[in-house]
A protein has these predicted regions:
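Juxtamembrane helix-entry segments on the extracytoplasmic side of multipass membrane proteins
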Residues: 1-3, 35, 58-62, 130, ...
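Hydrophobic/small/kink-forming positions within alpha-helical transmembrane segments
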Residues: 11-16, 46, 70, 74-78, ...
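Hydrophobic alpha-helical transmembrane segments of multi-pass membrane transport proteins
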Residues: 12-16, 20, 67-82, 150-161, ...
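Transmembrane alpha-helical segments that form core, pore/gating elements
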Residues: 22, 30, 138-197, 283
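Helix-helix packing/entry segments at the starts of transmembrane helices
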Residues: 93-98, 165, 169-180, 216-248
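Hydrophobic transmembrane alpha-helices of multi-pass small-molecule transport proteins
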Residues: 118-134, 257-276
């Protein structure tokens, strides 16, 4: 029960972060908002790590892979923050939910895992769901929708690398290095895009980092009490929080096509999660 509560709390915290990012995107560059997410997350995470978990931290056995992982997540964050600056939170997140499908599709190549016909069918059906949301040929495809889809693709590869690192590196170190890599890279472009924030905007930028930090902390705590495969279906609670925030604060509500695509993608993701759990039990 603890695992479920922590997991659901994470999927409440992270959409709040997205809401702040969407609000700020009306006045600040997407890259600056992304910088705030990384800078303040690292600022809050560093002291916690070294005060309470320093004895568990040792240098990575795969530093190059850690760098690639951090770079991929940074790209995913930029794509997502750009997408929500243009389209609704719910539509952007729905398209980003293709991430588990990417993991399943590429795990035979990068992780050496065997994927059966049933899971391949679920992957194909899930991608059909993403096409239902985008509706190519029926409506004009905008860059924001493609960026949201790109978020899911990049996040899928991020999850694959996370699995590879889980066998060698401490997850707390992985979390810290991911933030540091992203913060260093995004800071390099700040002199070229920086817009001076107001005091209110500074507080919201800090809030993005705080909610990101708390959200990921809850995720780590949830994984302490239960396997990721068992918790995977609860991640779709994030879309409910996103819809509520989008409707209440931005007057955005998903259309019928988005709901249909979401339904298809979520069912595919849950089916894949259940099949993976069954396969592990058989082994």
């Amino acid at each position: 029960m603890k695992a479920i509560i922590f997991n659901l709390l994470a999927w409440v915290m992270l959409p709040i972060m997205d809401g702040f990012a969407k609000y700020l995107s009306a006045d600040l560059p997407v890259l600056q908002i992304t910088w705030a997410r990384y800078f303040f997350t690292v600022a809050f995470t560093f002291p916690i790590m070294f005060l309470f978990y320093s004895h568990q931290l040792k240098w990575s056995d795969k530093p190059k892979l850690q760098f690639i992982r951090g770079l991929i997540l940074l790209t995913a964050n930029i794509c997502f923050f750009y997408s929500i600056s243009v389209i609704s939170l719910a539509k952007a997140l729905t398209l980003a939910f293709v991430a588990p499908l990417i993991v399943t599709a590429f795990s035979p190549i990068f992780l050496g895992e065997k994927v059966g016909l049933r899971r391949w069918s679920a992957v194909i059906i899930g991608f059909i769901g993403s096409l239902v949301v985008i509706r190519p040929g029926f409506v004009e495809i905008n860059l924001a929708s493609l960026a949201a889809l790109g978020t899911g693709i990049m996040y899928g590869f991020y999850l694959i690398i996370t699995r590879k690192l889980s066998t060698s590196d401490n997850p707390l170190l992985t979390l810290l290095l991911t933030g540091v890599v992203g913060a260093i890279i995004i800071s390099m472009v700040m002199p070229f895009v920086w817009v001076k924030p107001t005091l209110n905007q500074w507080s919201m930028m800090a809030a993005i980092g705080i909610f990101a930090c708390i959200g990921h902390l809850f995720l780590i705590l949830s994984l302490k009490y239960a396997d990721a495969s068992k918790l995977a279906p609860f991640s779709y609670f994030e879309i409910i929080t996103n819809i509520i925030i989008g409707y209440y604060f931005f007057s955005d509500f998903p259309d019928n096509w988005t709901f249909l695509g979401l339904f298809i993608i979520v069912l595919s993701g849950i089916y894949i999660s259940r099949r993976e759990s069954l396969v592990k039990k058989v082994k």
